[in-house]
C-alpha cells in the first residue's frame, strides 16, 4: 500500500518531473586558524559601526533572523598595491583563432580524444616551476593522502588554473560514421538511448574545446551617462558561487534511473555523468580553491545556492560536507566492495577531497535538498524504498497507470558491478543501506547547520530552522558594510519557487535596516523569482526589492543555465543572475568580484569556471556525458523537423547561453551608500583584471 501511495504522489506531479530544473533551460569542524564570530539567536547581526538596540521593526511576523557576522581573512580588508603574481599581457589570440571554432560542433566529437575522520586542511601542493598563469592539459598528480594508514588518491588537475575567459567546452555531435542528422534521427526513433553511454563516442557525442568568452559588459542600469568601464577602482568583495551539484547516489534503489524517454517526460532522471557527480563537485571546489590561492587575496566567502543533493539522501549530504570540509569521500552505497579491482578506477573508489580551506561559505537550500527527486514531499514510502533492498515498481498496485508512462518512466539504479553501469529496474535486489535515508526540510537545514567548515551554521540559525525556514541575513566580510540576505524560496510541495508573506515581511524589514545603515545589499536564493505566483508575485517582489537603491544583485541557481535579467521599479533596478549547474552541461561555477569605480558606479564582474580536469579523467568523461545528454532532452520547443537542422539548433542554443557566462554588470548606488563605502579601506587590486583575465591555456604538445 505504501508503494501505491508513493506512486500516486509521484504521478500526481508527473507533468513537473522533467527532472525539475531541466525544463528551465554531526561532525565537528576541522581545526582552522581563523577566528569565528557567531551571533546567537534573538537579534539582527551587528553591522559595522552599529549596535542593534533600535533596529527591531514591526512587520517581521516574529521571524527575526540572526546571522553570522562574517569572518575576515588576514589582509582581505586592506591589501593594496599590485598582485603578487606576475602575469603576461592579455593575449591577442582571439583575433587569430581558427574560424571553425565559432561553428557548431558537428562532426568533431572525436578530435579530443560511518564517517571517516576529517583531517585538518592541507596547504595547496606546490605547482611546477613554470609560469603559474599558463595552463595546459599536462596534469598535476597530487599523489595521495594517508588517513589512518590508508593512502587515498587526490584528483589530478591541469597544471595551472584557467577560466572560461581562456577556453571552454562545446557540445559535439556526429562522427566519421554518422552525421549529426543520423544521430538525431536515431535518438528521435528510440534506436539510440541516453543509457547507451558506451556508444556516445561512436556517434560523436561529447565535447571539444573552443576559445573562451570575454566579458560581456552591460551598462543598462547606469541611469545617466556611461563613462566607460575603467577596469580599476576598489575591490569590495571577491567570492565564489556554486550551484546545483545535485550529488547523486547512483546506486540508490529509489532513483528514477529507468526513465529513458517518453512524450510525457521530456528529459530523463538518468544522467550518465551522475556516477561521477562527487568527482565533478570536488573538482569545482579544488579549482575554486586553487584560483583563490593564486590571487593576491583569498576569496572573502563562498555562496552555495542549493540543490547540493539530488534525492535529499543523508549520504548525499555527507559527501557534500566532506568535499567542502576536506576528508575521505567514498561515493559508494549498499554493498561496500570494489567491483573493479584496484584504486581510482571506478566511480565507487574512495578518494581524498582537499576541501575549500579557510573560506567561509553560506547556504541557500534548494528543492532537491528537501524533496524526493526535487519535486514531491518526502513520505514514509519514499524512506522505506530508499533504505530498502529492492527497486520498487513505481506503478505497483496502481491500476490506472497507462502504458505510455510505464514505457519510459520508472525506478532503477546504475549498477556499479558492471563497467558500463547499466540501469537495473524494478524488482532488482540490492544491498540495503540506512545511510540512504531521505531528509525532511528541517533535517536538511540541520545538516547544513552542522556541516564542517566556517562559519558555524553557515548563516543558518536553529530557531528559524525549527520553524521550517532557511532564510537569514549576515555580513559575510567582517567590519564591512556589505549585507548578504539569503532567501528560502522553496514551496515545500513541488519544485517551483515560492515566497511566503511572512518571509517577504522579514525581507522588507532587513532592507529597511540596510537602507538606514547605508549598506550595499546582495541577495541569494536557490530559485530565480520569475516563478513566484503565490500571495507574493514576481512583479510584487521585484517592485519591493528594486525600490531599495542599495540592492545591486540577486544571485540564484536552479535553472541549470546562465542568465542575467534586470528587475526594475520606477527609475531604479537591480540585476538578477542565474548560474548553470555543476551536474549538467556546461558544468560551471562562478567567481564574483564587486568593484567600486567611484562616483557611485559599481561594476560586478562575473567569471565562470569549468572544472580544471585533464583529458581522460573521471571529470572530463562526466562533462562529455553531460554534453551528450543535451541531445536526448534538448528538443523541447524545437519545431524544426529536419534532424540535421535540429542538431544545429541545439548547438546554437548552447552557444547563445554562453552570452550570459562572463559578464560585467554595471549599476549606480545612491550618494549615501557610496559615501559610506568610501569611509572604509578596500583592496586596490582588481583580481578579475590582474589575474583572471591574464590566465592562458595551451594545449599539451
Regions found by a protein language model. Give the residues of each.
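Active-site neighborhood of phospho(di)ester-bond hydrolases with catalytic His/Asp-centered motifs
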Residues: 241-243, 300-307, 357, 362-366, ...
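Bacterial Sec-dependent N-terminal signal peptides
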Residues: 9, 15-58, 80-103, 111-126
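Short, solvent-exposed loop/turn and secondary-structure capping segments
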Residues: 250-255, 312-318, 322-323, 333-334, ...
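Core catalytic region of metal-dependent phosphoesterases/phosphodiesterases
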Residues: 276-388
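Bacterial N-terminal signal peptides that target proteins for export
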Residues: 1-7
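Active-site environment of divalent metal-dependent phosphoester hydrolases
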Residues: 310-312, 368-374, 493-494, 528-532, ...
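Metal-dependent phosphoesterase/phosphodiesterase active-site architecture
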Residues: 125-293, 300-301, 363, 383-517, ...
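Active-site-proximal segments of metal-dependent phosphoesterases and phosphodiesterases across multiple
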Residues: 491-556
Amino acid at each position: 500500500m505504501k508503494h501505491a501511495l508513493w506512486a500516486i504522489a509521484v504521478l500526481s506531479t508527473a507533468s513537473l518531473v522533467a527532472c525539475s530544473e531541466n525544463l528551465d533551460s554531526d561532525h565537528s569542524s576541522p581545526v582552522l586558524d581563523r577566528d569565528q564570530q557567531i551571533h546567537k539567536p534573538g537579534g539582527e547581526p551587528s553591522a559595522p559601526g552599529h549596535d542593534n538596540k533600535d533596529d527591531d521593526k514591526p512587520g517581521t511576523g516574529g521571524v527575526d533572523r540572526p546571522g553570522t557576522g562574517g569572518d575576515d581573512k588576514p589582509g582581505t580588508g586592506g591589501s593594496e598595491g599590485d598582485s603578487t603574481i606576475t602575469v603576461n599581457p592579455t593575449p591577442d589570440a582571439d583575433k587569430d583563432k581558427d574560424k571553425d571554432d565559432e561553428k557548431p560542433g558537428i562532426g568533431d566529437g572525436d578530435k579530443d580524444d560511518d564517517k571517516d575522520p576529517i583531517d585538518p586542511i592541507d596547504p595547496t601542493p606546490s605547482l611546477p616551476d613554470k609560469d603559474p598563469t599558463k595552463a595546459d592539459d599536462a596534469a598535476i598528480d597530487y599523489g595521495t593522502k594517508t588517513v589512518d594508514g590508508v593512502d587515498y588518491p587526490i584528483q589530478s588537475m591541469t597544471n595551472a588554473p584557467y577560466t572560461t575567459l581562456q577556453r571552454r567546452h562545446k557540445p559535439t555531435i556526429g562522427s566519421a560514421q554518422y552525421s549529426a542528422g543520423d544521430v538525431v534521427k536515431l535518438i528521435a526513433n528510440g534506436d539510440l538511448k541516453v543509457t547507451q553511454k558506451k556508444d556516445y563516442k561512436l556517434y560523436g557525442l561529447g565535447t571539444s574545446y573552443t576559445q573562451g568568452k570575454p566579458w560581456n559588459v552591460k551598462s543598462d542600469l547606469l541611469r545617466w551617462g556611461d563613462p566607460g568601464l575603467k577596469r580599476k577602482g576598489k575591490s569590495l568583495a571577491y567570492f565564489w558561487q556554486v550551484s546545483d551539484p545535485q550529488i547523486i547516489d547512483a546506486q540508490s534503489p529509489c532513483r528514477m534511473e529507468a526513465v529513458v524517454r517518453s512524450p510525457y517526460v521530456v528529459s530523463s532522471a538518468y544522467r550518465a555523468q551522475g556516477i561521477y557527480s562527487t568527482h565533478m563537485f570536488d573538482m569545482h571546489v579544488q579549482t575554486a580553491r586553487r584560483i583563490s590561492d593564486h590571487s593576491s587575496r583569498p576569496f572573502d566567502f563562498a555562496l552555495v545556492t542549493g540543490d547540493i543533493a539530488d534525492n535529499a539522501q543523508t549520504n548525499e549530504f555527507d559527501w557534500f560536507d566532506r568535499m567542502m570540509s576536506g576528508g575521505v569521500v567514498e561515493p559508494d552505497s549498499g554493498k561496500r566492495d570494489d567491483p573493479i579491482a584496484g584504486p581510482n578506477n571506478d566511480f565507487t573508489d574512495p578518494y581524498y577531497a582537499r576541501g575549500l580551506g579557510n573560506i567561509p561559505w553560506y547556504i541557500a537550500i534548494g528543492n532537491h535538498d528537501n524533496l524526493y527527486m526535487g519535486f514531491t514531499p518526502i513520505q514514509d514510502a519514499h524512506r522505506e524504498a530508499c533504505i530498502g533492498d529492492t527497486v520498487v515498481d513505481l506503478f505497483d498496485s496502481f491500476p490506472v497507470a497507462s502504458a505510455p508512462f510505464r514505457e519510459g518512466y520508472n525506478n532503477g539504479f546504475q549498477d556499479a558491478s558492471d563497467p558500463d553501469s547499466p540501469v537495473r529496474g524494478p524488482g532488482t535486489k540490492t544491498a540495503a543501506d540506512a545511510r540512504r535515508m531521505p531528509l525532511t526540510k528541517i533535517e536538511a537545514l540541520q545538516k547544513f547547520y552542522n556541516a564542517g567548515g566556517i562559519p558555524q551554521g553557515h548563516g543558518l540559525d536553529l530557531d528559524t530552522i525549527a520553524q521550517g525556514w532557511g532564510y537569514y541575513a549576515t555580513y559575510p566580510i567582517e567590519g564591512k558594510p556589505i549585507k548578504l540576505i539569503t532567501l528560502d524560496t522553496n514551496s515545500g510541495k513541488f519544485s517551483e519557487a515560492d515566497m511566503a508573506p511572512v518571509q517577504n515581511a522579514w525581507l522588507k524589514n532587513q532592507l529597511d535596516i540596510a537602507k538606514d545603515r547605508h549598506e550595499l545589499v546582495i541577495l541569494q536564493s536557490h530559485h530565480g523569482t520569475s516563478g513566484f505566483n503565490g500571495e507574493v508575485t514576481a512583479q510584487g517582489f521585484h517592485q519591493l526589492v528594486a525600490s531599495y537603491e542599495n540592492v545591486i544583485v540577486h544571485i540564484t541557481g536552479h535553472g541549470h543555465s546562465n542568465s542575467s535579467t534586470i528587475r526594475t521599479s520606477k527609475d531604479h533596478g537591480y540585476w538578477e543572475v542565474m548560474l548553470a549547474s555543476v551536474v549538467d552541461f556546461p558544468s560551471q561555477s562562478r567567481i564574483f568580484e564587486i568593484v567600486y569605480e567611484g562616483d557611485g558606479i559599481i561594476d560586478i564582474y562575473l567569471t565562470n569556471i569549468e572544472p580544471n580536469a585533464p583529458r581522460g579523467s573521471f571529470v572530463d568523461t562526466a562533462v562529455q556525458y553531460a554534453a551528450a545528454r543535451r541531445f536526448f532532452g534538448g528538443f523541447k520547443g524545437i519545431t524544426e523537423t529536419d534532424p540535421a537542422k535540429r542538431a544545429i539548433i541545439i548547438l546554437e542554443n548552447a552557444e547563445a547561453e554562453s552570452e550570459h557566462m562572463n559578464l560585467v554588470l554595471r549599476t549606480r548606488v545612491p550618494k549615501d551608500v557610496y559615501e559610506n563605502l568610501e569611509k572604509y579601506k578596500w583592496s586596490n587590486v582588481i583580481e578579475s583584471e590582474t589575474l583572471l583575465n591574464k590566465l592562458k591555456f595551451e594545449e599539451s604538445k
